[in-house]
Amino acid sequence: MARVERLPRPGETLTDAEFFTAPGGKGANQAVGAARLGARVRFVGAVGRDSFADEALSGLRESGCDLDVAEVDAPTGVAVIYVDGSGENTIVVAPGANGLVEPVEPEGAVLCQLEIPLPAVETAGSKASFFCLNAAPAKPVPVDLVRRADLVVVNRYELEALPETPRLTALTLGDEGAVLLEEGEEVARAEPPRVDAVDGTAAGDAFTACLVVSLLEGRPREEALTRACKAGALAASRPGAQPSLPTAEDVDAL
């Protein structure tokens, strides 16, 4: 990750960046986020046999996640992130080993993203007691996958890429908060608390993890959405991806 005062223009070189590496990835961030909120988490994924593998898994281990991770003959997935002074970012992902994640059929609730192969997502959601699809990054997905999901989490751009309207959608709106849509009709809305945004890299992952955990705890939809917005705001107010993810105590105190 490189922190810069402003994002570079095409062809421009900036020389005042602060650079560091940290574990991340949508799936890993959401797993760590859910674990910090008190959920028992099993993380399924893949890493390469390289120097990035241990760091990629370090946050998951520290958060107490159970790991079901294969070592494969491909580089560990990485993302190159630029974050400007206002917390806005641009991200380029080299999926590497993530593209070789094998399908599994986990029991219980399942949260998947689209940074792994679609067959793995489809299989994981096929027998889940609760299936949440975070349809990110935006890409074409089979209509059956959307129909199977109990909850689909998207931003405006990802919503446009869906083949049809999900049964239940959490639509994130950045600093405007989020809405829950049932069959396309708004049923709940929440605004985030005002914070000084530092880095929005994991804000969406914090939101998604908190929303899923809150719903699985049996909280009413509006309360779950409000807590999720708080989690996202807290993550945006801290630097880094996994280091920014809040605990349940953090969320409840805001």
Give the label of every model feature segment.
Residues 42, 57-71, 79-186:
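Ribokinase/PfkB-type carbohydrate-kinase core domain
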Residues 164-254:
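Conserved phosphate-binding/catalytic region of the ribokinase-like
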Residues 28-32, 126, 147, 222, ...:
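A broad detector of short, well-ordered amphipathic alpha-helices
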Residues 32-40, 83, 214-218:
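Alpha-helix C-terminal capping segments
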Residues 1-44, 53-55, 197, 241:
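Glycine-rich phosphate/adenosyl-contacting loop at the front of the ribokinase-like
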Residues 18, 94, 191-192:
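Short clusters of small/polar residues that mark proteolytic maturation junctions
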